[in-house]
């Protein structure tokens, strides 16, 4: 393979999520609700060489542009990610993710006594910290395994 040869082919229309930390691509797919059963065309590169990250993952989703809510959640596990919107095989929009101040309804609180885990009509809300998130209701902080608490459908 030459330096100019693509490892994964270009997509005609959709979203490319680049500069994902190595090993996180499967979590990205889970966040997007992609499990291979719907027939979506997906290309995944894992642990490919990267000048910026050393090793990175990349996900290409044909025929789908991400919502801002999806991008906000992705930023929690892939803060260095770049989102590329592709149309007619050309990148028409490119931006780095930015972490929101809060996320609502996308994470589950691990505290069994939190009001969001009971049979109450309360969506979870977390404040985004430098190294994790804090439940706005009970104060529980999640620093590790954040992807395990994501509940986006």
UniProtKB/Swiss-Prot annotation:
Keywords: Metal-binding, Pyrimidine biosynthesis, Zinc. GO terms for biological process: 'de novo' pyrimidine nucleobase biosynthetic process; pyrimidine nucleotide biosynthetic process. Its cofactor is Zn(2+). Zn(2+) binds at residues 109, 114, 135, 138. GO terms for cellular component: aspartate carbamoyltransferase complex. GO terms for molecular function: metal ion binding. Binds 1 zinc ion per subunit. InterPro entries: Asp_carbamoyltransf_reg_N, Asp_carbamoylTrfase_reg, Asp_carbamoyltrfase_reg_C, Asp_carbatrfase_reg_C_sf, Asp_carbatrfase_reg_N_sf. Pfam families: PyrI (PF01948), PyrI_C (PF02748). The keyword ATP-binding does not apply. It comes from the Archaea. Contains catalytic and regulatory chains. Involved in allosteric regulation of aspartate carbamoyltransferase. Belongs to the PyrI family. This is Aspartate carbamoyltransferase regulatory chain. It comes from Natronomonas pharaonis (strain ATCC 35678 / DSM 2160 / CIP 103997 / JCM 8858 / NBRC 14720 / NCIMB 2260 / Gabara) (Halobacterium pharaonis). The gene is pyrI.
